[in-house]
UniProtKB/Swiss-Prot annotation:
Reported function: Dual specificity kinase acting on both serine/threonine and tyrosine-containing substrates. Phosphorylates serine- and arginine-rich (SR) proteins of the spliceosomal complex and may be a constituent of a network of regulatory mechanisms that enable SR proteins to control RNA splicing. Phosphorylates: SRSF1, SRSF3 and PTPN1. Regulates the alternative splicing of tissue factor (F3) pre-mRNA in endothelial cells.
SMART domains found in the cross-reference section: S_TKc
Positions where Phosphothreonine occurs in the chain: 138
Predominant location category: nucleus
Organism: Homo sapiens
Source lineage: Eukaryota, Metazoa, Chordata, Craniata, Vertebrata
Domain annotation Protein kinase: ranges: 161-477
Biased composition (Low complexity): 100-112
Name of the molecule in the record: Dual specificity protein kinase CLK1
Superkingdom of origin: Eukaryota
Amino acid sequence: MRHSKRTYCPDWDDKDWDYGKWRSSSSHKRRKRSHSSAQENKRCKYNHSKMCDSHYLESRSINEKDYHSRRYIDEYRNDYTQGCEPGHRQRDHESRYQNHSSKSSGRSGRSSYKSKHRIHHSTSHRRSHGKSHRRKRTRSVEDDEEGHLICQSGDVLSARYEIVDTLGEGAFGKVVECIDHKAGGRHVAVKIVKNVDRYCEAARSEIQVLEHLNTTDPNSTFRCVQMLEWFEHHGHICIVFELLGLSTYDFIKENGFLPFRLDHIRKMAYQICKSVNFLHSNKLTHTDLKPENILFVQSDYTEAYNPKIKRDERTLINPDIKVVDFGSATYDDEHHSTLVSTRHYRAPEVILALGWSQPCDVWSIGCILIEYYLGFTVFPTHDSKEHLAMMERILGPLPKHMIQKTRKRKYFHHDRLDWDEHSSAGRYVSRRCKPLKEFMLSQDVEHERLFDLIQKMLEYDPAKRITLREALKHPFFDLLKKSI
């Protein structure tokens, strides 16, 4: 029986080993990105006062080591069509994604038209182990000083799972790829949670959600990642999952931040909406939807030289996805934390502390879809007021009734956003953001339909925002339904 109030652990939302990050695809160190949930709230207490207008000096570069380094978007679509260097579209990562590296999935260093006939198979690789805060606890002889289980290839867990590789390691635990010797030698992913009370309790909360979803949908018809089982190993909770491909973010990153094809976006979007609608129908809100938490079932691709951008371009073979990371999922009747979602995908009602429910997931999906379409986020910021200013630049003014209702009065003056468009920050927002429809790369009817869907998902008022049940009937998916 699930608890009426879920245990909340700040590091749960900031874990740098969540399932979406296990299947990485780049050996390059990642830049920080905006904080998820409570970790961001905590750091804001110390860092908000440090923000000043000079921080937004236009001479700053993407390589600045400023704490508030942001993930930059392209100035305009020409930067994308002319084949901008990938670094200009690089995503800023938060602490939950620090120290993450892996081996590239077999790409040749030389462009070749012959490569269009070559199929590449994505592979996982060990992530580098970053520093984390030491915690007072009782350690077993098999734990390191931070609470990680000490293990290596060849070790066997629960007399069944033989470790063959470490896929990820972070503040919350580690993830290993294993051979399941009691299931015909299939490969699985096993999360090994730190032997620390608060982490174990948070893991139990996720297990409750996963058990509910797996019982309700045993065949994974609704594309939520399947938990195969869980067990305890010397004080560590271990969760066994099916092994999936790369996250959609990792695929974009490995592909030089080039966007997905429209037909792939259509299929991915439909599956995401169907999956999350399943959560909503079961009185759950995911609360942390983002490209990192959407994984391909298989991320194999073909590769061919694209003369327009003068580089190799990867094309997925199969765009089928699954939704992962239910550590922050919240039932309707449970306590709702004030701050949820990763910054770039955070709904306005969350920023304004107006309360949230399932519509905040719909907003996140809208942000995800435009990122799939462009290859970059349209909300590259770490600051709430600047985030609201970007929303207004892209979507128009915030509704007065939401402004009047919020207790975040510091963001407003006379029921308007307190924002100076002529300041350095204001010029930055004006330069980097533009009305939503101006991001369209084509006036084709299918592009129009996609942006109509995105606009309905990015409706400010959660009461007026399209539901996922309605979204699944949107004309953008008509071609998909005809092909079934």
